[in-house]
């Protein structure tokens, strides 16, 4: 029979446990805080938001919506306007410069460790009044149709711009090259409707890359983490969660997060929440903004650039940019002299260095 031994020593009065250690907040403020230099072991958290780019301009009364969707009656005669197309939103944050000497063997770089994000304005999807199509045919009776339909939610955090792949439903669609960025018409073919590895790009501008024909490139983006979901359907109810307790880890399988090149952080987002249906059955895409909170730390890395390349870049960039005729196809002959030799018997002799570094002499025919 076992016995339970009781601790007969009562706890001493006045002794308490120590508080749990948490990160020490030393600076808090707006964008001006980014200019301050902090210690080597400090972390930085940046809060920002990206507004949607659904097609309507920032001055329009329908900002946050696309223009009316116009289904085409013919594949060869489609009337597509660029305001119908939701696009990706892009934000770039300039981080504090960490290195005063770029010639050192070891450098400090900002590394994105984790982020918190959510779609802001989910509450607006509960609006069931106003100038929208109603379920009841009687005027002024019954609720209006809420936002419903296609849901596309995407965000990316990286140390450089998001690398993207062009793929579309119909390569004959008349995209406007001046208002949106798409490959030239002469490069589009039926291969554009599947994966054409020649149609790649970099998302370097806000509000000009249409969502329907650009997607993140899975074969690249080693320095970017992206996340996305899609729910199709014309009348699909939006399903969105919002909380400030979920943290997304940005580290890869080696424990390394996106390294911010040139001390810049790139945020990309697109959030399509469905269609707004008007009384005349016209439909517009509805987009919502996205909030981001990104935590960064300082990471020691090996300097990937030798001093020679840095100096070469410095001298090259000091020259003014010029636009000239294309010389690659107009240069007829190049001669390089080095040292001396005996007088050759053929003044038109052609010699060159092959790709293996060996000297070759062409025998005349």
Curated annotation (Swiss-Prot):
Species of the source: Bovine polyomavirus (BPyV)
GO MF annotations in UniProt: structural molecule activity
Subcellular location: Virion; Host nucleus
Entry's Gene Ontology BP terms: endocytosis involved in viral entry into host cell; virion attachment to host cell
Official protein name in the record: Major capsid protein VP1
Extent of motif Bipartite nuclear localization signal: 5-16
Major localization listed first in the record, in broad terms: virion
Domain notes: A DNA-binding domain overlapping a bipartite nuclear localization signal is present in the N-terminal region of the protein and is required for efficient virus formation. The intrinsically disordered C-terminal arm interacts with neighboring pentamers. The unstructured nature of this region allows to make different interactions depending on the structural context: pentamers present at the 12 icosahedral fivefold axes bind five pentamers, whereas pentamers present at the 60 icosahedral six-fold axes interact with six pentamers.
Function: Forms an icosahedral capsid with a T=7 symmetry and a 40 nm diameter. The capsid is composed of 72 pentamers linked to each other by disulfide bonds and associated with VP2 or VP3 proteins. Interacts with sialic acids on the cell surface to provide virion attachment to target cell. Once attached, the virion is internalized by endocytosis and traffics to the endoplasmic reticulum. Inside the endoplasmic reticulum, the protein folding machinery isomerizes VP1 interpentamer disulfide bonds, thereby triggering initial uncoating.
Superkingdom classification of source: Viruses
Lineage: Viruses, Monodnaviria, Shotokuvirae, Cossaviricota, Papovaviricetes
Subunit structure: Homomultimer; disulfide-linked. The virus capsid is composed of 72 icosahedral units, each one composed of five disulfide-linked copies of VP1. Interacts with minor capsid proteins VP2 and VP3.
């Amino acid at each position: 029979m076992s016995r339970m031994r009781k601790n007969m020593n009562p706890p001493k009065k006045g002794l308490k446990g120590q508080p749990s250690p948490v990160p020490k907040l030393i600076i808090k403020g707006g964008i001006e805080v980014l200019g301050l230099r902090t210690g080597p072991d400090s972390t930085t958290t940046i809060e920002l938001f990206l507004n949607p780019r659904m097609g309507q301009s920032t001055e329009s009364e329908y900002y946050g919506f696309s223009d009316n969707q116009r289904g085409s009656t013919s594949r060869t005669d489609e009337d597509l306007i660029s305001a119908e197309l939701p696009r990706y939103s892009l934000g770039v944050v300039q981080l504090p410069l960490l290195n005063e000497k770029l010639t050192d063997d070891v450098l400090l770089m900002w590394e994105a460790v984790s982020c918190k994000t959510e779609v802001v304005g989910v509450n607006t999807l509960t609006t069931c009044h106003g100038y929208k199509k109603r379920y009841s045919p009687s005027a002024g009776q019954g609720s209006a149709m809420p936002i419903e339909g296609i849901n596309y939610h995407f965000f990316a955090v990286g140390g450089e711009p998001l690398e993207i792949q062009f793929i579309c439903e119909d390569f004959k669609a008349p995209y406007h090259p001046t208002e949106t960025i798409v490959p030239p018409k002469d490069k589009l073919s039926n291969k554009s409707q599947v994966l054409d590895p020649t149609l790649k790009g970099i998302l370097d501008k806000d509000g000009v890359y249409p969502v329907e024909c650009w997607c993140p490139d899975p074969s690249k983006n080693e320095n970017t983490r992206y996340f996305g979901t899609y729910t199709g359907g014309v009348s699909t109810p939006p399903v969105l969660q919002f909380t400030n307790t979920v943290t997304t880890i940005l580290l890869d399988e080696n424990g390394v997060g996106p390294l911010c090149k040139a001390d810049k952080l790139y945020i990309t987002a697109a959030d399509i929440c469905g269609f707004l249906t008007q009384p005349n059955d016209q439909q517009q895409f509805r987009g919502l903004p996205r909030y981001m909170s990104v935590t960064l730390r300082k990471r020691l890395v090996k300097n990937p650039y030798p001093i020679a390349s840095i100096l070469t870049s410095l001298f090259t960039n000091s020259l003014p940019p010029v636009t000239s005729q294309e010389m690659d196809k107009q240069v007829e002959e190049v001669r390089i002299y080095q040292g001396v030799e005996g007088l050759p018997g053929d003044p038109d002799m052609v010699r060159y260095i092959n790709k293996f570094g060996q000297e070759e002499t062409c025998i005349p025919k």
